Amino acid sequence: MIETSFIKWINSFKDLSNSIEDLKELSNGTIFNEICCQIAPKYFDIDSLRKDGLDNWIFREENIKNIVERVDEFYIEEMGLNDQISSINCEEIANENIDEIILLIEAILGMAMESENNEAVIENILSLDQDTQNDLMVVVAKIQQSHQPNTVDNSKSFDKDGSILSQSPSQSNNSISNNNNNNNIDSSNISKSNISSNNNNNNSSNNNKEEILNLQNEIEKLKREKQEIQNDLDESNIQLSNVTMDRDRITIDKQKTEEVCSSLHESIIGLQKQLDETMAQTTTMNALNDETYKTEINDLHMQVESKEKQLSELKKKVDEANRLANENRSLRDEIDILREKAANAEATEEKLKKHQKKIEEIGDLKKKIKELEDQNDSYIQQTLDLEEQLSKNNTYRTQADSGKQQISSLKIELAKLELSLKSIKEDRDKLSESLNTVELERDSLQSQVTNLRNTIDNQQQEYETKFVDLQSSISLNSGGSGGLGDEVIDGSTKERIARLERDNKRLKEVAEKASELENQLEDANQSKELLTIQIKQLEEQKQQSNNTNNNNNNNNMVDSSEIESLKQQLKEKEKEISTLKRKLEESNLSLDENRKQLVELSQRPTTQSPGDIEKLENYENLLKENDGLEGRLRAARNIIKDLREKHKSYSNQETQLATKDEVITKLEGLVKKKTDINEDLRKQLEEGREESQREINLMLSAFLKIGLEMEQVKIQNISSSKEPRSFLNKKRAD
């Protein structure tokens, strides 16, 4: 295949940007330019072509046109050939037409064989395999055959004075025939003059006869030479028509014919001189023999006149033949022009059809462009409206989302508040019950405290009386009896007195503690009342929240502030409970000591006074009171546990609020992502607009180029129609 051989030949060049595997890869023109730069660097430049945007066929067509113009310039300047690449269609090459690519490769190969670097090209061809060499040699021979008829010099003819005229082969044949006719006429005239001179000199001298015979022989020789020259010219014409490839032979034949013609012309000039001399001699001889030869001369004149008439007729015929030949030439020229016009007309018709199709497509595209512009304007307006709506919708969405979230959170909080209210109601009921029990216990404790105070007062009075009696008895005993009584009083009564004093102190402390506990119970009752008041306020706030949903945030703030206040109250109560625990521990320690003392007293002999028995009873009563106080403390602890559970519920609400805050942050992140996505979409829209504008600009530039080409084609058609012979005149001038 010729395509594979062309691919191998192209890949044989060095320093190519990339090797090819298919001829369609040459459609962008870069590899063509690199090859041409290696073949003829005078006419080509590596940086003259575009290397970006080659996916567009318009840019590829511009590159191919640039290469074709440089190749045509090489053919014109280096080889003197015109219109060697006019048949190549650059648009088809840009659209990857293999036939047009092969034509351009053949033109570049012909340029390579005629360039200065043809030796390197031949070496590259010889380095290939035999099949590709044979294919390339066949292509080279075909290219040279197409170049040689135009490069061979036209044949030349000579006029009577020996001037050289450049003519075509047909014109040379006509000129040779005309020259032959003229030579025949001259020879006939010469023969007539010689005959007349011989007739005039027959009687005068034999020398003149011999000279005339010699002249006739020379004329016959000249005729033979003319015939031989005609034969040579015919042979040369045949050789010119057949052998157009061999320039050297044609130039040699031309030189030979020019030498022969020049020699013939010189011989003709010498013969004319001789004839003039003989005519002068004959005139002198005629002057002597006028009378004798008048009759013969008249006859000869008659013959000459008849022959002159024949010659004039022949000249007329020759003129008519020349005129007809000129007409034939003009007709041939016109036929050639018409043929070229027909060929060009077909090509121009095809181009016109293509351009008409393109113009129709341009019109459709213009309509589409207008529609697209209108659509773009409408889309732009729609996008602007949508962007405004988006911005508004985003604000509305954020507001709606925030409102929904607030409503949902408020609903959840309402449900929780309802549950908390239920629990608070239950707690309130429990607290009310516990308050009732506490009040009852308080009343009982107050009654016990009053009884204890009364008993303590009575015991103090008894102790004082006993103490006075003891002092008096001690004083009496000290005055009456001696040391045994003192020893008894010292051993038994003093210890009892000290113990009783201690018991009195402890009882006083217990009484003080009881008063403190009463104060604490009063504080607890006050806090209970405050809690009941707060519960009522929460119920009122719940009713207000059901009636008014717009003040939810404020209510939440109030709830949070109330929760904080409740927390603080719980902390304070915990502190109070801790202090109460400490006091209870101290009282328990004191009770343990009293119990130990009671055990010691029970172990001693039962010689107790009625006062001691009363003290023991009082002590037992105090223990009972202590047990009652412990029961109250337990009830207070239960209340504190309930308050702690409420605190836990409030802490759960806080955790839920924290989760809500996290959800809100997540929603804010989603909103940010949506805004980022909207910004990306805007950027993509802007990029799409810019790309559409670029494509429209490219289309407009392509349409403008097509319009310019159409106008150039019209101008060329107009110029060719006005000057029919301009094409041949250009060729002849070249």
From Swiss-Prot:
Biological process annotations from GO: cytoplasmic microtubule organization; cytoskeleton-dependent intracellular transport
A Gene Ontology term for the protein's cellular component = cytoplasm
Biased amino acid composition, Low complexity: 163-207
Keyword Cytoplasm attached? yes
Localization, UniProt: Cytoplasm, Cytoskeleton
Biased region (Polar residues) positions are: 146-155
A Pfam cross-reference name = HOOK
Residue ranges constituting the Calponin-homology (CH) domain according to the UniProt record: 1-113
Output the Gene Ontology terms for molecular function.
Answer: dynein light intermediate chain binding; microtubule binding
Q: Where is this region: Disordered?
A: 146-208
| Functional note | Cytoskeletal linker protein involved in tethering membrane bound organelles to the cytoskeleton.
Identify its protein family.
Answer: Belongs to the hook family.
Its subunit composition reads: Homodimer. Interacts with microtubules.
| The name this protein goes by in its record | Protein hook homolog
Source organism (scientific name): Dictyostelium discoideum
Q: Encoded by which gene?
A: hook
